Regions:
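C-terminal non-catalytic regions of proteins with extracellular/luminal or membrane-system context
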Residues: 1-176
Length: 177
């Protein structure tokens, strides 16, 4: 199941009827359909599998003792139907450009957004950060080197995850399992 168990959903609804000041902590090993939870929560913390010190770490986040700096390693779907069963697509060489954005998907939902509720790499903080002077170069070792400056623009101490992604536009090799 990609939703919360019915008992937990019922408990959440009872709490939501009494207050709108809700911070939801989700402890799960996979992305869930959290749309209803997200709509009624001031914040959602994806704690995943936090381990033995998880309660203390989560408490520090909720009370502002520690500044959150994590980013999602998966997308949180808008609805269960957005979760693919498999992803075996081969890159076709049809590069996504500003001219063909509408044709990126061959089928789409008509009644909900075609985007996730929270995308891969999403994460909030109690402060802001500015990433500047980004420099990308290929080294003599044939590795890509990325350098940048990160500045905290807020009043709260924090750490930022600098996200850098690479994708080939054409697959030259089809790997078989």
């Amino acid at each position: 199941f990609l939703t919360l168990p019915e008992e937990q959903q019922m408990l959440f609804e009872k709490i939501a009827k009494r207050t709108d000041n809700i911070v939801t902590v989700v402890i799960s090993g996979r992305p869930l359909d959290l749309r209803r939870i997200s709509e009624k929560s001031k914040a959602v913390i994806m704690a995943w599998r936090p381990g033995t010190m998880g309660a203390e770490a989560i408490t520090d986040l909720v009370y502002g003792i520690t500044n959150p700096s994590g980013k999602l390693a998966v997308s949180i779907p808008w609805c269960v139907g957005q979760v693919p069963i498999s992803y075996w697509d081969i890159k076709t060489g049809h590069v996504l450009t500003a001219d063909n954005l509408e044709n990126r998907f061959t089928s789409r939902y008509m009644d909900i957004p075609n985007t996730p509720l929270y995308p891969f790499g999403f994460g909030l903080s109690y402060t802001g950060f500015d990433i500047s002077d980004v420099e990308v170069r290929m080294g003599q070792d044939k590795r890509v080197h990325v350098h940048c400056n990160v500045s905290n623009t807020g009043n709260v101490a924090g750490a930022e995850v600098v996200q850098c992604y690479y994708e080939t536009s054409v697959s030259y090799t089809h790997l078989r399992a």
